[in-house]
């Protein structure tokens, strides 16, 4: 079988010694109602939801949908999760926290946080001065926000849990406003504090709580800047059309690439830490570390949503993922590959075609080096874990199992952990769930955080299944379900609702009503249930834990 064709290896793009590919994730479920060219867009990291709000600065045809402006939250598959009628004011920027809360910054300095189901969970203001001077630019990161006023004052909050506005040094009024703004988050900055990068004139100013540093650059004006996910590199688009990459301490010039376009891109983002991606109308350009490049053409508007290991590309109809091909996948499927992993896949193909040469291929793998067959098995398992296509996952697992049968010392743990991981990943990638997370993203996010996000979207049954498969503590899921059931109790009496919740809890764990459910019950005027919950916390009855699932 031509595995290169099956895997799309013919369409991989090579930038220097690295391969990149673009994979379709979903045909988006939101239909023909969305025109991204007229929208403000914010995508949550780790394959999270997408928030859309009509951009008031863009000219739109007057229709029923444009007259009814709303802030909509969709899953990555385009399924509507929440619709928030929007009458709050002018939006400067939107972003997402590490807890998957949508952050909306208004031009009067107000900051609003929404849950994925559209509830306003927090709001605060950065100061009265923004009511006069207004917010000029804003940047949002996973735990905070910073705003620049039209009077060039910088105010930030570095912890949404305790939103205390803090001031940075005020800029002396420049000849022209900053052309762009970026941040190095505290966890990535050498100083361990927030650093703000402002492109002003020909240079960049670095601002932190200690002061303002002029980096004495001469390449400006810079039209776009973007900080690498590891915080160590800065990509810039210059006024004369160069993509310029430098270190964030401004000590090294890493690369320059002429795009031959003086029109700035609509977006400039990083694809992992190896390359940068630029978007102009109907064109996406990827530039590698040594000047190699590849262009993708489109006939509809796009938005680029950067991830730790690639870039999600959403259009009016599709979501795709542009990323570096994992080394194990290259090893197995690169055209002409003669690696142990590639030969093991060939051996499986021969076996399934009843070709007697399969055993000869296994013998050849063994003769490559002393550990060739084990290497081939491990490579196939690693490639399967990174693969998005389920039939290819299954084929790679069969190849690994076939190779393992010839090993004298078999270790089933890696096979078991890989199949369990893929079971979990495939479950959350279903379009009804809409969480197309990769193995690399899951390792950075952690399985426990993914389960928490599923619970927040009310996918409690799937969250409990993942807890069972991945051997995670199910109590946070159960607690969240209980609180949500109280909030959605409707006309059910306190006593009846209490019995229903307790019966479900007994089927899953030895927990009674969680302590903070009393506050949830009081918030919906269920005083009797709140009192019962507090009594159970003070004197918890004995319960027998049984392995079961909420239905």
Model-derived segments and spans:
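WD40-like beta-propeller blades
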Residues: 1-275, 279-308, 324-345
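Extended non-globular scaffold/tether segments
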Residues: 2, 8-26, 30, 253-260, ...
């Amino acid at each position: 079988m031509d595995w290169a064709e099956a895997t799309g290896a013919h369409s991989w793009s090579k930038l220097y010694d690295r391969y990149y590919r673009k994979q379709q994730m979903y045909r988006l479920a939101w239909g023909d109602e969305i025109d991204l060219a007229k929208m403000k867009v914010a995508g949550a990291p780790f394959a999270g939801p997408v928030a859309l709000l009509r951009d008031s600065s863009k000219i739109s045809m007057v229709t029923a949908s444009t007259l009814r402006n709303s802030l909509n939250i969709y899953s990555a598959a385009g399924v509507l999760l929440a619709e928030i009628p929007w009458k709050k004011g002018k939006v400067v920027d939107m972003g997402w926290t590490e807890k998957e809360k949508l952050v909306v910054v208004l031009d009067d300095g107000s900051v609003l946080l929404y849950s994925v189901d559209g509830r306003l969970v927090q709001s605060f203001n950065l100061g009265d001065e923004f009511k006069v001077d207004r917010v000029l630019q804003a940047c949002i990161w996973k735990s905070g926000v910073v705003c620049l006023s039209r009077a060039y004052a910088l105010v930030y909050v570095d912890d949404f849990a305790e939103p205390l506005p803090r001031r940075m040094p005020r800029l002396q009024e420049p000849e022209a406003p900053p052309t762009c703004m970026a941040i190095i988050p505290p966890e990535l900055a050498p100083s361990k504090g927030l650093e703000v990068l402002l492109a002003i004139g020909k240079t960049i100013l670095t601002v932190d709580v200690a002061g303002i540093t002029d980096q004495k650059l001469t390449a400006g004006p810079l039209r776009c800047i973007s900080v690498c996910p590891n915080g160590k590199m800065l990509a810039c688009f210059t006024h004369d059309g160069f993509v310029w990459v430098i270190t964030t301490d401004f000590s090294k010039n890493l690369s320059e690439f002429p795009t031959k376009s003086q029109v700035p891109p609509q977006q400039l983002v990083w694809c992992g830490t190896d390359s940068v991606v630029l978007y102009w109308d109907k064109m996406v350009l990827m530039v590698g570390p040594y000047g190699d490049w590849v262009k993708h053409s489109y006939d509809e508007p796009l938005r680029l949503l950067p991830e730790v290991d690639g870039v999600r590309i959403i259009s009016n109809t599709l979501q795709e993922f542009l990323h570096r091909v994992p080394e194990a996948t290259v090893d197995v499927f690169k055209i002409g590959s003669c690696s142990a992993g590639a030969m093991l896949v060939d051996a499986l193909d021969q076996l399934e075609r009843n070709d007697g040469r399969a055993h000869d291929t296994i013998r050849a793998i063994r003769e490559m080096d002393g550990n060739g067959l084990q290497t081939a098995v491990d490579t196939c398992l690693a490639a399967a874990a990174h693969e998005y296509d389920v039939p290819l996952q299954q084929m790679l697992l069969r190849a690994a199992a076939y190779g393992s049968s010839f090993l004298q010392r078999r270790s089933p743990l890696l096979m078991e952990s890989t199949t369990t991981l893929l079971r979990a990943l495939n479950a959350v990638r279903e379009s009804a769930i809409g969480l197309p997370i990769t193995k690399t993203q899951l390792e950075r996010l952690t399985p426990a955080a993914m389960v928490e996000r599923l619970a927040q979207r009310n996918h409690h049954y799937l969250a409990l299944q993942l807890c069972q498969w991945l051997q995670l503590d199910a109590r946070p899921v159960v607690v969240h379900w209980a609180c949500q059931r109280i909030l959605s109790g409707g006309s059910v009496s306190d006593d009846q609702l209490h019995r229903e919740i307790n019966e479900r809890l007994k089927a899953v764990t030895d927990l009674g009503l969680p302590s903070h459910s009393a506050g949830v019950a009081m918030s919906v005027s269920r005083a009797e249930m709140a009192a019962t919950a507090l009594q159970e916390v003070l004197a918890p009855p004995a319960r027998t834990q049984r392995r079961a699932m909420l239905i």
